[in-house]
Amino acid sequence: IDRYTELTGKSPMLPRFAMGLHVGTYSGGTWKNEEMTSDKYPPALCKRLREEGVPFDLLWLDSTWRLFNTTYGNGGCCFEWRNTFKDPKAMFDSCYAQNVKMVGLHIRSILDNGPEYHLLDKAREQGNVLYPGAKIEGVVNFFDPKAVDWWWENGVMKVASIGAKFVKTDVGGTMDLKGLHNIFPLAYAEAPYRKFQEYNNMRGVTHTREGYAGIQRYPYIWAGDWGSEWQWFEPVIRCLLYTSDAADD
């Protein structure tokens, strides 16, 4: 393991509270029920968990906070809130007032247009932001520091500036090129990990699904879209034990 981590990197220290329980929510509306989401739901969930004595420290909002546009539907990310979230900043503030340490958001590597920011069009106009070897136009070129800076300033800061403190990265396996298919998730996970670490002025945290040798440098790893029954949970335990043996977390 020492030789492996000397080559691929070691897991960094995390904020102490990041070792606690993480809770995810669809904000009251799961897939195909997005109209049921509300910015009132996450604070109400926090309140209920506190009342029940559930000790959690991190909360993230899964996909349904995002406005799904017609270009890529739920597969793209325009960093715009759906209209059921009337006051996202107040939502973040309410969660933090209940001693939640970090609130994060699920995102995708594919940019999309929204009615306000037109992020995909702006990336096209900027040039050198999107990766030309992706299966779908719109994937950010996370190998290029300048593209990462543009993505951060024009996309992520729309949510970080009002309270998001980390992201849950999804759709990391978007490269057709075999030589980059496994490397892309590393660059994708590194970008928000380092950016939020600097912006929050604390040890970094991110959630990533895809990875490769070295992904342990940007923890955490999440297991993907699994059910809550034991038939799903048991293999996750086995998987994470193997991952731990590989020094990934």
Model-derived segments and their meaning:
Residues 1-245, 249:
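Catalytic-domain carbohydrate-binding cleft regions of carbohydrate-active enzymes
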